[in-house]
Amino acid sequence: MKIGYMTNAFGPLVGAGGGVTSVKDIRYVTMTDDEATLEQITKIGFKSIEVLEGNLTNYADDPQVLIDMLAKYGADMMSVCVGANFIYQDALEDEMVHLRAVAEMAAKVGVKYFVICGGAIRGKGIQPGDVELLAKGLSKAMEITEEYGLVACFHPHLGSIAEKPEEIDALFAASDIKVCPDLAHLKAGGYDPLTFIKK
């Protein structure tokens, strides 16, 4: 088993400003010094990391900078976490542009797992058919990740369609995507993590 450390514990989580007016430019970003964070993580014995998409795509103009940084500390980037709404059909095309850009960058630096969060909750709440829209969006995302040799997996997340046990079960009944079980999110959403993993 490979165990990694998520770098988002090292700073505030924000969204890239471009995403406010352009869906394809939305990103999660951890406000941290990436190299200092990598140094701290490897010092305590972890050799694999997961980052948020913005901390990966920040290096899109020169991926070698990130590749060299990982090599300097004898580390690898095992996964990247991305987010999307998936249920708004007029935005889905641009969300796939976003996911493709992240997948392309991930492949360049040797990432294996493409961890997906999402499934927006509408202002009027989860509506009939929303879970199916999420599942269809995830299918499109899986097609993209397969092109780049990445393994797509879904991370049930607080504040999304897949937060509560019945919501999570409904999604995985509608989708064959692999799972990334975040124990804290599962527990906070009311799902016993061990029960979920055994399923």
List the predicted regions and their residue ranges.
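N-terminal pre-domain/capping segments
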Residues: M1-V109, S139, E146, L150, ...
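Gly/Pro-rich active-site loop or hairpin
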Residues: L13, G17-T32, G125, P165, ...
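Acidic/histidine-rich catalytic cores of soluble enzymes
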Residues: S48-I49, S139-K199
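Active-site groove signature of glycoside hydrolases
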Residues: A106-P128, V151-H157
